[in-house]
């Protein structure tokens, strides 16, 4: 994902945690808060309890890719933090992971019905 579409600083993550709402999707948790911008930004958290660096990085890469593919359908104007809750995210089939991410976004109400949105995620 391009830099403009990512949360980068600890303050940005803390603001989403403080001002946003939380949705539980089993192996994945989602925090979302409005950001008053014309685009949505995403951040990814993989706690150390999920395993070593290789496992955590694999989870983060896979979740980031699932979000990148769904990004054109995300409603602009949200900061969204995805929190991994299970080491199984490193091993489940990618279509299953995509469905999990999509379900979390739908529960949060930040997913548009059509896929007319931002593109060129690179």
From Swiss-Prot:
Coiled coil: none
GO biological process annotation, one example: tRNA 5'-leader removal
Enzyme class per UniProt: hydrolase
Keywords for the protein's UniProt record, in alphabetical order: Endonuclease, Hydrolase, Nuclease, RNA-binding, tRNA processing
The EC number(s) this enzyme carries: 3.1.26.5
Catalytic activity: Endonucleolytic cleavage of RNA, removing 5'-extranucleotides from tRNA precursor
A GO term from the CC aspect: ribonuclease P complex
Membrane-spanning intervals of the chain: none
Keyword Transcription: no
PROSITE patterns reported for this sequence: RIBONUCLEASE_P
Subunit organization: Consists of a catalytic RNA component (M1 or rnpB) and a protein subunit.
Protein purpose: RNaseP catalyzes the removal of the 5'-leader sequence from pre-tRNA to produce the mature 5'-terminus. It can also cleave other RNA substrates such as 4.5S RNA. The protein component plays an auxiliary but essential role in vivo by binding to the 5'-leader sequence and broadening the substrate specificity of the ribozyme.
Protein name: Ribonuclease P protein component
Source organism of this protein record: Roseiflexus sp. (strain RS-1)
């Amino acid at each position: 994902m391009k830099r403009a579409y990512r949360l980068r600083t600890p303050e940005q993550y803390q603001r989403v945690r403080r001002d946003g709402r939380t949705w539980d999707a089993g192996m994945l948790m989602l925090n979302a808060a409005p950001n008053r911008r014309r685009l949505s930004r995403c951040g990814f958290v993989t706690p150390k309890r999920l395993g070593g660096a290789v496992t955590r990085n694999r989870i983060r890469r896979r979740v980031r890719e699932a979000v990148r593919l769904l990004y054109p359908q995300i409603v602009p104007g949200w900061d969204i933090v995805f929190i991994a809750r299970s080491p199984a995210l490193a091993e489940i089939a990618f279509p299953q992971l995509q469905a999990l991410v999509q379900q979390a976004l739908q529960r949060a109400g930040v997913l548009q019905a059509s896929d007319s949105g931002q593109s060129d995620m690179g």
